[in-house]
Amino acid sequence: MYINSGYLNNPRTDFKDNSTPLVVGSCGTYRLKTRPKLPTYRQKGRRDYQILYVANGKTHFWFDGREEIVSAGHMVLYKPEEIQKYVYYLEDNPEVFWIHFTGSDVKNILAYHGISLDEHVFYCGVLPDYKVLFRKIIQECSCAAMGTRTILHRCSTIFCCWWTASSVNRKKPPAMSKSKLNARRLTSTRTITQRSA
């Protein structure tokens, strides 16, 4: 199994931090090579939020006791203290990136980017940019000297890309040019950064 991950604090404990609007606690990726399956079951969930991006293959998730197979190009969102049950199978060739985050303004930040807390699975597309962003966040979580502003910028970029792709998937194309989308991303990053200062 291939694992690459970075942690802001202790990797064995989740945490809740309301001292700033958004804090990334950890980020990583899993890819099965020989292990037949990798199950995760958190009956009480975690204290933070989690996004999982299925970059390749498919994964099996359970929401409200029902199995849902999630294919490449989708992100899954878990809220704090929500039951988490999912399994990666070798035969499905899964490559999954994940990020755990917390903060005093997470709900508003997600809402600003059009990400509903009432849903779990969102289409966002299979883009190499996502892998690049996640890998950079992993690296930055591993190097505390990099600071949090860069990580916040990358999270904001992920949220903006997610919002754009999910809007298109809902048959509601965003009424924004590329320059307006970039301006929205910059505004979002500035807002998060200012609130963190």
Where are these regions (language model features)?
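N-terminal regulatory/effector-sensing and dimerization cores
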Residues: 10-12, 19, 26-116
